[in-house]
Design a protein with these regions (language model features):
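N-terminal Rossmann-like FAD-binding beta1-loop-alpha1 element of flavoenzymes
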Residues: 1-16, 386-398
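A conserved FAD-binding loop/helix module that cradles the flavin
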Residues: 151-170, 373-401
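N-terminal glycine-rich dinucleotide-binding loop that anchors FAD/FMN and/or NAD(P) in oxidoreductases
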Residues: 28-60
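Glycine-rich FAD pyrophosphate-binding loop
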Residues: 8-32
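A glycine-rich dinucleotide-binding beta-alpha-beta segment and adjacent secondary-structure elements
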Residues: 114-116, 121, 294-374
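Short hydrophobic core segments
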Residues: 15-17, 119, 132, 139-159, ...
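Feature captures the FAD/FMN-dependent oxidoreductase FAD-binding
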Residues: 59-144, 293, 297
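An anion/pyrophosphate-binding glycine-rich loop and adjacent beta-alpha core
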Residues: 21-29, 37, 43-44, 173-178, ...
Length: 403
């Protein structure tokens, strides 16, 4: 939509092909229905949140970055707010408010929208765009075409990768598609018992064999198949890469990252002195969420009704060790249909970063999730979609045909 809006600012004849009966179905789901539009951090910090290809977006961000996006919506009477970690949301907390602004901009610019229309192929003449063949057999002549069809996630919204398939048929290389911002499955079954339990301000130490490869603090949520939550999602891309190399990956959850092992042992010793007549189960409720206690003791091989005064030194040491390193072995990432974004896509080597035009086909442009860039949660991916869409739309409208 942003590509069509910007292109129609600069040229008269813009057509938007929409597979669904209304636009923006995927946008409505973003930010859990609240639409995390962007992030208010500086450019270098923003680019650092991408998984390795963020520098490709520097030209697009210089043209249309977070402040320009914020102005775009505020100039159209949508108030925005900045929340923790500099995440930007509409004041309404509703993604349909964002969609409404975009729809009005399309209407104002007289963009012609074909609803319930799917594309079948792009036709070329001497490596130059000639037009678009639709699924009903009709043909739309076009000098410029912008492909912004998204990835493979949330396929029920109509995002099923047609644009990538067409790009590949036209000779573009696709970096293998894989899930990003995705929950992780574990070999152990106890997360199912803890389903829904959120642990905040814990440290996750991901390990490859005996080597610690990531160590970050954040929030984790147990699920019926393993673990999820903001921290898990943001690290899942790296985990997926290691798993694809057949590496053995496990995570140690540090439930008390503010305390060293020695400090924690001293704290536990004090708790035991104060609660000698209580059961270990009741005593640990001062240190752990109630829902976690039984599972924790089962893993430590300690009877929950055992009196604190009966706890042996070796058992106390097991408790401390487990508080600092509750282990889960990662079996795999959830499949693409459970991911928030698609990693991979059209190779950046075949896209001009200054225009978003294909280096292989004149008049063909790319934008959004279908190109090989991806980032953490926090508004980074949506800003990349808006920025590449804006740049592609502007470039398509003003770039000469080069005949």
């Amino acid at each position: 939509m942003m590509a069509a809006i910007q292109a129609s600012q600069l040229t008269l004849d813009v057509v938007l092909i929409e597979k669904n009966s209304y636009p923006g179905r995927k946008l409505l789901l973003s930010g859990k229905g609240r639409c995390n539009l962007t992030n208010n951090c500086d450019l270098d910090s923003f680019i650092a949140r991408f998984s390795g290809n963020g520098q490709f977006l520097r030209d697009a961000f210089k043209k249309f970055f977070n402040q320009e996006l914020i102005r775009f919506f505020e100039d159209r009477h949508l108030s925005l707010k900045i929340e923790r970690q500099l995440r930007v949301f509409p004041e309404t907390d509703k993604s349909d408010s964002v969609l409404e602004v975009l729809k009005k901009a399309l209407n104002k610019n007289k963009v012609k929208i074909f609803y319930k229309t799917a594309m079948k192929d792009i036709l070329l003449k001497e490596d130059r765009v000639k037009g678009l063949l639709l699924s009903d057999g009709s043909f739309i002549a076009a000098d410029k075409i912008i492909l912004a069809t998204g990835g493979l996630t949330y396929s029920f919204t109509g995002s099923s990768g047609e644009g990538m398939k067409i790009a590949q048929r036209l000779g573009h290389h696709l970096v293998p598609l894989r899930p990003g911002l995705v929950p992780l499955e574990t070999k152990q079954q106890y997360p199912k018992i803890l389903e829904g339990l959120a642990l905040k301000n814990i440290r996750l130490n991901f390990c490859d064999g005996k080597r610690k490869i990531i160590s970050e603090i954040g929030e984790l949520i147990f699920t019926d198949f393993g673990i999820s939550g903001p921290l898990v999602l943001s690290l899942s891309g790296k985990i997926a890469d290691w798993l694809s190399e057949n590496k053995s990956v496990y995570v140690e959850i540090d439930l008390k990252p503010a305390l060293s092992k020695e400090q924690l042992e001293a704290r536990l010793f004090r708790e035991f002195e104060l609660n000698a007549k209580k059961t270990i189960k009741n005593t640990l409720k001062a240190l752990l969420p109630k829902k976690l206690v039984d599972v924790f003791l089962d893993l430590a091989k300690i009877m929950p009704e055992k009196k604190v005064s009966q706890i042996m030194r070796a058992e106390r040491q097991r408790i401390v060790s487990q508080l600092k390193a509750l282990r889960l072995d990662i079996s795999r990432c959830r499949p693409l249909e459970n991911a928030m974004i698609t990693r991979g896509g059209v190779s950046l080597k075949e896209i001009n970063s200054r225009t978003m035009e294909s280096r292989l086909i004149k008049g063909l442009y790319f934008a959004g999730e279908m190109i090989d860039v991806d980032a953490d949660t926090g508004g980074f991916n949506l800003q990349a979609a808006f920025s590449t869409g804006y740049l592609a739309g502007e470039s398509a409208a003003v770039e000469p045909l080069g005949l």
